[in-house]
């Protein structure tokens, strides 16, 4: 311990302090104060306060359900995007395609490691609307993908984004909105919960099991399960090249990506995130819907699935062009069959 104190004094607190964080400390005032004391591009704040301190670490790890692509049973062919246009410095899919309301929506994965499914169906939903020029505005069901794709992984215990897109092309997915919306064939059956603050939902109290695969639509829906299926015509991985990812979004809409979550990320509130401190919590899948530059720092604009109470109203920005936390290494997408 004496050596650690002396060493910190020699090399500076900012270089040594991250190593002394224990797992129970990662979502505390200590972490927030440390991040905000750095000269960095983002601001930390108090998230997950409604979760008891002794459960926060385990709760956030549970939400990180994207399994490493190297272990995936599905390897998608990489698509080379022809960058035949001048890409703008700033791009936001919500502005580019205002006729598609799903681009502005934030879903809630609840207490389930289903981020891999949410990142996929969110991008699929957006791309169907974009490809149809706003004619098709339904939601692809996270419930259907989570519960019925046996090759995708382990449901609420994690899955593979690449396998999710492969399933979309091979088996198709039905429609389904968020919990208690009664939208579509199979809405999400896991309830919203307050991960972060005392708010409008019930508190998150414990892990939830993967829903059972049901190949019937909820009562009152006007189609059969098989008639409600929607398919991808092509699915692929996208090069980790920054320009390739930008061109893919610019041409076809949001993509799904996965990155490594470290224990400082859950405290994000604003700015352009880059990892500063803490241990690895797991992989997390999200939807990238644009990019830009903030105070000379390039970023990706990302929609999370931890409801709108987290971060910057549910969204966040992360450093672009440096493969920050692996965000540019596992990008997948596809085109819908209309």
Language model region names:
Residues 2-8, 12-338:
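Catalytic-core signature of thiol
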């Amino acid at each position: 311990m004496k050596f650690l104190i002396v060493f910190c004094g020699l090399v500076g607190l900012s270089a040594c302090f991250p190593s002394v964080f224990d797992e129970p400390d990662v979502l505390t005032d200590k972490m927030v104060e440390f991040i905000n004391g750095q000269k960095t591009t983002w601001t930390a704040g108090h998230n997950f306060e409604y979760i008891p301190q002794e459960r926060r670490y385990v709760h956030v790890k549970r939400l990180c359900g994207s399994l490493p692509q190297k272990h995936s049973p599905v390897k998608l062919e990489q698509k080379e995007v022809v960058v035949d246009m001048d890409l703008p410095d700033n791009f936001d899919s919500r502005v580019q395609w205002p006729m598609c309301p799903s681009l502005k929506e934030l879903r809630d994965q609840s207490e389930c490691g289903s981020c891999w499914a949410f990142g996929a169906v969110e991008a699929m939903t957006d791309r169907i609307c974009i490809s149809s020029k706003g004619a098709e505005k339904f939601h692809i069901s996270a419930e259907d993908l989570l519960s019925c794709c046996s090759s995708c992984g382990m449901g609420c215990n994690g899955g593979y984004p690449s396998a999710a897109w492969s399933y979309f092309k091979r088996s198709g997915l039905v429609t389904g909105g968020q919990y208690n919306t009664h939208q579509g064939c199979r809405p999400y059956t896991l309830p919203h919960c307050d991960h972060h603050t005392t708010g409008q939902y019930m508190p998150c109290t414990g892990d939830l099991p993967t829903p059972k695969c049901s190949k019937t639509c909820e009562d009152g829906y006007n189609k059969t399960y098989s008639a409600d299926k929607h398919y991808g015509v092509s699915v692929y991985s996208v090069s980790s090249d920054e320009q390739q990812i930008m061109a893919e979004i610019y041409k076809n809409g949001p993509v799904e990506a996965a990155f490594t979550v470290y224990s400082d990320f859950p405290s994000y509130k604003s700015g352009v995130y880059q990892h500063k401190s803490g241990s690895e919590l797991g992989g997390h899948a999200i939807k990238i819907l644009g990019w830009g530059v903030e105070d000379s720092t390039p970023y990706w604009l990302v929609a999370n699935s931890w409801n709108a109470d987290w971060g910057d109203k549910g969204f966040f920005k992360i450093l672009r062009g440096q493969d920050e936390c692996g965000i540019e290494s596992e990008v997948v997408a596809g085109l819908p069959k209309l």
